[in-house]
Amino acid sequence: MAIQSKYSNAQVESIIAELLAVLEKHQSPTDLSLMALGNCVTHLLQKKVPAEAREVVAEQFAKALSRSVKS
């Protein structure tokens, strides 16, 4: 069963396009891009997710990321 998102595809695609445009603007190689994006994820987890939920959210994110590259 597909997971329903509360965000539209247009919202998600717009943010992705902007993030990728910034990385392209800086001619960021893949390893630097992944490092920067990973640091952004860490920042969001630390600033926007309650401490008691961070580990679970991080694990869910990691599992979703792993599944997305297997498909």
From Swiss-Prot:
Membership in a protein family: Belongs to the UPF0352 family.
Gene3D superfamilies, sorted: YejL-like
InterPro entries associated with the record: UPF0352, YejL_sf
Protein name as annotated: UPF0352 protein Spea_1764
